[in-house]
């Protein structure tokens, strides 16, 4: 019986170690991108206040669209409503007001430029008659969860909602990976913005 318990304990310990190592690797990989990646900035909208995970992160929405380019391979992904995993090419400073711009979308990186993989996209049509129709453009969905201090979540959420017309999502891109590293309100990082509001209510 003791030997059986020892084996069970060893198996449980090994499982926990694997989970801890995997979690640690995710953190290391995130920090590597967040600290050394190319900065890309997109206008964003506030999270959904009915989100059941409110208090753990803010949910944002970035609305980006890019015209269809027949040179970029799509395979069979043409359904007008279905999201598909995509790669996007980004011009970090190609948009208006110092924002970034998505310049291409495909199933995988193709050609030079700053590419981010693992994002979602949806084909859009002005007139859809069948699966062989080329889309007119793509809607691109970027990472949308910004994790934060739970004690400040409600306050950050209120401030973010009130200031959403001047909100910018700051991403970092490195080696094809894209992470949401910060949110700016009126050009100020969210945590700093809150500290200033607290100091001068």
Range-by-range predicted roles:
Residues 1-6:
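Short, Lys/Arg-rich N-terminal segment immediately upstream of the first membrane anchor
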Residues 7-29:
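Hydrophobic membrane-insertion alpha-helices, especially the h-region
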Residues 22-44:
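Aromatic-capped interface at the extracytoplasmic side
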Residues 29, 51, 63, 164, ...:
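Extracellular/lumenal and peripheral-membrane lipid-interaction modules
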Residues 42-74:
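Short extracytoplasmic
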Residues 53-56, 74-86, 155-167:
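Short nucleic-acid-contacting surface segments enriched for D/E, G, S/T with interspersed K/R
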Residues 66-127:
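Structured domain cores in non-transmembrane regions
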Residues 100-104, 116-201:
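Extracytoplasmic/periplasmic terminal helices and flexible tails
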């Amino acid at each position: 019986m003791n030997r059986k318990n020892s084996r069970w304990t060893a198996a449980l310990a090994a499982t926990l170690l694997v989970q801890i190592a995997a979690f640690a690797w995710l953190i290391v990989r995130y920090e590597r991108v967040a600290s050394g990646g190319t900065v890309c900035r997109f206008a964003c909208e506030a999270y959904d206040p009915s989100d059941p995970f409110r208090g753990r992160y803010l949910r944002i929405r970035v609305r980006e669209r890019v015209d269809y380019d027949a040179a970029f391979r799509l395979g069979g992904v043409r359904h007008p409503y279905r999201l598909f995993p995509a790669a996007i090419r980004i011009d970090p400073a190609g948009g208006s007001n110092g924002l970034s711009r998505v310049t291409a979308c495909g199933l995988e990186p193709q050609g030079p430029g700053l590419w981010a993989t693992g994002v979602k996209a949806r084909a859009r049509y002005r007139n859809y008659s069948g699966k062989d129709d080329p889309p007119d453009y793509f809607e691109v969905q970027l990472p949308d969860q910004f994790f934060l201090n739970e004690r400040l979540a409600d306050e950050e959420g209120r401030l973010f909602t009130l200031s959403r017309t001047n909100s910018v999502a700051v991403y970092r891109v490195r080696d094809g990976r894209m992470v949401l590293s910060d949110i700016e309100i009126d050009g100020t990082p969210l945590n700093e913005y809150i500290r200033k509001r607290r100091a001068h209510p």
